[in-house]
From Swiss-Prot:
Residues 329-521 form a coiled coil. Residues 12-22 have a biased composition (Acidic residues). Residues 1-24 are annotated as: Disordered. Pfam families: SAP_new25. This is UPF0746 protein DDB_G0281095. One of its GO terms (molecular function) is DNA binding.
Length: 1097
């Protein structure tokens, strides 16, 4: 491993409680490192020195190093706590105990049994008679969910594997443990004991043997990555594993908090689910929730799913106890009381502020008015002064003009007297007159300028007035805005007060409910009640008259139904309080809550609530429509009106989804309920209403045809009168009475009898669509209702077969017919009803050969496949198979991708018919033969399932061409053998190929060895190594000097890589050490092995 010496030095000398370890990086020192200042290369160097992968981003490497130190801290704390224990508390070395049999009177036969059972020779002789060696303990490969769910004793198998150190194939990597954590979550003593054993075995403090310890070190150790295992257990919501993990390694809250901060997103705890609440409450109870991860509010609340009425009653009680925490509720109540007090104080402060604001506004208005008045007065004074100045100037000008005129008159008089003297001066006077005219013009201009100035002053006054008006308008707008803001604030305040009052009302109601429910304990209910679904319990309270449990509280009694309602109401109120209306739509109660508990609501109100649920499941729709059409016991007119209202697409939304087309789920369930009423008038009203609405339908409201509606719902009719009604009124609008129609299926014998009579009277046949029955016989149909329907369908099939003049069969194609037959056979074997197979196979209708090649991938469960094969191949011998193989022998060398018709072998088998008679343990009666075709590959698989390997080898010897490289690899190819072959038979094949080596069998031998390597069958390779001849030919590199070996270097490297890729580390070590690889190739394989080992840790 990378820099192992440095890592061991740190592991041996590191002590987190000692700060004097200069030169060594401790957890405390690493925590002091500034993440922003340290460079990525430095972190990579530290990771490399610790033997950790140093690839990835800076944050990934940092978390990897921090996780390493957290794990070291847990190891040191665990070692110190064990060392510091008083001697009397430390574990004592186990001493050999003498076991005493407590039962005194033991039957003599039992003593003989145990003597024989413990005798190895007798034991092996007895169990050698058990032929089935397909799968054994050594064939269990890894751990997946199928393994954990398929085997009821899966826990015990894993325990035995861990304790016995058997093959190290069940737990081979981290992924195997993760699959365990994903699956095993049930809290019981068995699971708790299992996890304790698991953690004890795969930890550095384990006291197991040296061999086991070395094997474990090849896989992983839990305390190497404490933080990552905490992350995996929390994310997979496995509380049992997490609790035992914390207790076993004595992990303190600081380590848990740090691990959660490193690897868990805070939003993970905001999910509203049952398991998430369990994990969160547990971590909170041990003070392991970081501040950043404290649940503030739920990110998504879907009560219709999380509080479904399909869950068990005890889960509802546990959900209530997990969610409605009295301590948290007390804190919430105190918080809301404080908020109410704060709101009252805020109201008083707001009122004072409003009063002060009003006073300030009034003062501002007064000041503004005074300023405006002053400005107006000043403007008036200025105007008056300007006018006075202008008048004075005009008066002066007038006086000057008068003086000038008087002077001019005097001068004229003198001129008249002295005409002769003034003639010489006339030119001068004319000039003076011109000057006077100019002066007059100037005066006029001055007057015009004065007028313009006056106009400008008037305009300025108007502008000032407009500005004043605008200011007044702005002030008014500001006042209006302030008033609107005040109104909005008042409305918001009223809403807050209303919500606060509503929440306080919720708190009072919830407080009362908590007091009532605190008196209820699990012991008050029976186990049947606790393990029953809520829906079943509520249905029982309707139909039964058994005495319900009574809980007395303040002289108030409540039955089981009322208790269930209180649990739901308490959870709903609690979520309303903590969410404060943030998720009103998701906080809608499950629809069944309204059906069972809101009896005061009328049908219209229930219908409106139902339309508000966008996700409508078929069963929920059935319950709703049944409750309003049948359980409500409405009068005839009310039922007719209700049908019309539900079908009214324009006013209702029951059959529409937003953004999608017609909702057939709710419509089909509605029609089913109407037909189930067997009310002729109601059914007729439904059909006629749909016909009217079809005239105005569009792409989103397109109803199915009337023929489809009648045909698909005919199965729910149980009265002959309804059949006659359809025949008389809708014969031309439905295919129900057409010749060769397939719509006659019904679950009631009287209806089938009646329609048979009608069809016989009109001279027409019914048709049975055989392929349509296929899905009814698959393993998916597990509930009782469908099992009942399967029995009815089988009766219908038998009826049709027994009446060939009235029924015809439609097979569609041979493939689907064969699939349906196989599904029927699989169902028959699953339910122990092999008589059905005896009825169908020899029948003339199914006489054509059917294809058997899809049986492995068909309907029967894997553990039932051998039974079906045994039933069909019971009378087929190897001698009868041999000539059939010779017939297709010529095709073995023809390359092809898919098998054609010529590649299938026709075979014939016999089976007892239903006419046989049982006599004791034997069946005496008529036997009939039936034909089928099968590919050679599938033939060998069937022989393999029947433990008939001797027959396979017999056919190999008789027909060597079967080993052709173009054909036989389809059976011995690696991927196929990996899925079906056990270690026992795989070793048989390997030995057979070794004894019969040729150019073809070498390829098959290599495939088998690759399968053994990939599966981790270490014992097969140990057996090969124990034989010098086999080891030299199989596990040595073929070179020019070593021609005795079969495989070249690249083939052997590929075989080793199979074990590395499959995490078979023990086998990988064995093969790398045993095969004579060149140093370069051995180095490459070791590097790949180490990289894969680090990744899996």
């Amino acid at each position: 491993m990378v820099n192992n010496n440095k890592r061991k030095e740190i592991e041996n000398q590191e002590n987190d409680n000692d700060d004097d370890n200069d030169g060594l990086l401790t957890y405390k020192k690493f925590k002091d490192v500034d993440y922003d200042s340290i460079r990525s290369k430095e972190l990579q160097t530290i990771a490399k020195s610790l033997g950790l992968p140093n690839n990835g981003k800076k944050q990934e490497v940092y978390k990897r190093i921090e996780g390493y130190f957290l794990s070291k801290k847990v190891k040191n704390d665990l070692t110190n706590s064990t060392t510091n224990q008083p001697p009397q508390l430390q574990q004592k070395q186990p001493q050999q105990k003498q076991y005493v049999l407590l039962i005194k009177d033991v039957d003599q036969l039992e003593i003989y049994f145990w003597k024989a059972f413990r005798n190895m020779i007798i034991f092996k002789n007895i169990f050698s008679n058990f032929k089935s060696k397909q799968f054994g303990y050594h064939d269990l490969i890894g751990i997946n969910e199928n393994f954990l769910k398929s085997y009821s004793n899966s826990l015990e198998i894993i325990k035995d594997n861990i304790k016995g150190n058997i093959n190290h194939q069940i737990i081979r990597s981290v992924n195997d443990i993760v699959n365990i954590i994903k699956t095993l979550k049930k809290k019981d003593n068995e699971t708790i004991s299992f996890y304790t054993t698991l953690f004890s075995t795969f930890s550095s403090s384990s006291s197991t043997t040296t061999t086991m310890q070395s094997t474990k070190s090849l896989i992983f150790q839990f305390d190497e990555n404490i933080d990552l295992w905490i992350q995996r257990m929390i994310l997979n919501e496995n509380l049992v594993a997490l609790d035992q993990f914390i207790k076993f390694f004595k992990i303190n809250s600081d380590v848990l908090k740090k691990s959660i901060e490193m690897h868990i997103n805070p939003s993970f705890f905001n999910v509203f689910s049952y398991n998430n609440l369990k994990i969160y409450n547990y971590l909170k109870s041990i003070n392991a929730i970081p501040t950043s991860h404290i649940k503030q509010r739920f990110s998504n609340i879907d009560l219709s799913e999380s509080l479904s009425f399909d869950y068990k009653f005890k889960r509802l009680i546990k959900s209530y106890k997990l969610l409605v925490d009295p301590t948290k509720f007390k804190e919430i109540r105190e918080i809301h009381q404080q908020q109410q007090q704060q709101q009252q104080q805020q109201q008083q402060q707001q009122q004072q502020q409003q009063q002060e604001q009003q006073k300030q506004q009034e003062q501002k208005q007064q000041q503004q008015e005074q300023e405006q008045q002053q400005q107006q007065q000043q403007q008036q004074q200025q105007q008056q002064q300007q006018q006075q100045e202008q008048q004075q100037q005009q008066e002066q000008q007038q006086q000057e003009q008068q003086q000038e005129q008087e002077q001019q008159q005097q001068q004229q008089q003198e001129e008249q007297q002295q005409e002769q003297q003034q003639q010489q001066q006339q030119q001068q006077q004319q000039q003076e007159q011109q000057e006077q005219e100019q002066q007059q013009q100037q005066q006029q201009q001055q007057q015009q300028q004065q007028q313009q100035q006056q106009q400008q002053q008037q305009q300025q006054q108007q502008q000032q007035q407009q500005q004043q008006q605008q200011q007044q308008q702005q002030q008014q707008q500001q006042q209006q805005q302030q008033q609107q803001q005040q109104q909005q604030q008042q409305q918001q305040q009223q809403q807050r007060e209303g919500r606060q009052l509503q929440i306080l009302d919720y708190i009072e109601k919830l407080d009362q409910l908590i007091l009532e429910l605190n008196e209820i304990q699990f012991s008050h209910f029976t186990d049947d009640q606790l393990n029953s679904t809520i829906k079943n319990l509520l249905n029982q309270t309707k139909t039964t008259t058994t005495t319900p449990i009574l809980i007395t509280n303040n002289n108030n009694c409540s039955d089981l139904k009322d208790i269930i309602k209180k649990y739901y109401k308490s959870i709903y109120l609690f979520l309303k309080i903590i969410e404060e209306g943030k998720h009103d739509r998701n906080l809608m109660r499950p629809f069944h809550y309204y059906l069972y508990f809101k009896k005061k609501m009328n049908v219209s109100q229930l219908y409106e609530i139902f339309c508000g649920f966008f996700i409508k499941k078929y069963d929920d729709c059935l319950i709703f429509f049944k409750s309003i059409l049948i359980d409500q016991q409405l009068e005839r007119n009310q039922r007719l009106e209700l049908v019309s209202k539900i079908l009214d697409i324009e006013n209702g939304v029951s059959f529409q989804n937003i953004g999608s087309n017609f909702n057939f789920t709710s419509f089909n369930s509605f029609c089913r309920v109407v037909f189930s009423t067997n009310d002729t008038e109601l059914i007729d009203h439904l059909i006629k209403t749909i016909k009217k609405l079809q005239l105005a339908q569009n792409s989103k409201t397109q109803f199915p045809s009337i023929s489809y509606i009648i045909s698909i719902n005919f199965q729910y009719i149980n009265k002959n009168e309804i059949v006659d009604f359809f025949f008389e009124n809708y014969r031309n609008e439905t295919t129900l009475f057409d010749d060769q129609n397939q719509n006659w299926n019904n679950n009631h014998v009287n209806i089938i009898d009646h329609i048979e009579k009608i069809m016989e009277s009109i001279g027409k046949k019914l048709q049975l669509y055989f392929v349509k029955y296929s899905n009814w016989f698959t393993n998916g149909n597990k509930n009782n209702e469908k099992k009942y329907n399967v029995n009815i369908l089988l009766d219908q099939l038998k009826r049709a077969i027994s009446k060939p003049l009235l029924y015809s069969f439609f097979f569609d194609s041979g493939y689907y017919c064969n699939t349906t037959l196989l599904n029927i056979f699989g169902w028959s074997l699953e339910n122990g009803n092999e008589v059905v197979i005896n009825f169908f196979l020899p029948n003339e209708i199914f006489k054509q050969p059917f294809r058997f090649s899809d049986i492995i991938y068909g309907a029967p469960s894997p553990n039932k496949i051998p039974n079906l094969i045994k039933l069909i191949f019971n009378n087929i011998s190897k001698e009868s198979i041999e000539p059939k193989l010779y017939q297709v022998k010529g095709n073995f060398n023809i390359p092809h991708l898919y098998y054609g018709r010529d590649d299938f072998i026709p075979l014939t088998s016999t089976i007892s018919t239903t006419n046989s008679e049982e006599v004791g343990q034997f069946i005496i009666g008529e036997t009939k033969s039936f034909d089928f075709i099968i590919s050679p590959r599938m033939l060998f698989i069937c022989l393999y399932y029947l433990d008939r390997f001797e027959d396979i080898f017999y056919l190999f010897d008789k027909i060597p061409e079967i080993f052709s490289s173009t054909y036989f690899p389809n059976f011995t190819k690696e991927s196929y053998l990996y899925n079906i072959c056990s270690s026992y038979y795989l070793e048989l094949l390997i030995n057979y190929f070794i004894e019969n080596l040729n150019d073809n069998t070498i390829n098959h031998l290599y495939n088998c060895l690759c399968v053994a390597s990939g599966k981790g069958f270490t014992q097969i390779f140990k057996n090969i190594l124990s034989s010098n001849k086999n080891s030299q030919s199989l596990l040595k590199v073929r070179t020019k000097t070593n021609q005795s070996s079969l495989f070249q270097l690249n083939f052997l490297c590929g075989m080793v890589l199979k074990s590395i890729d499959s995490s078979n580390f023990q086998l990988s070590n064995l093969l790398i050490d045993s095969i004579d690889f060149p140093p370069k190739n051995k180095r490459v394989l070791n590097q790949k092995y180490l990289v894969h080992l680090i990744i899996n840790k």
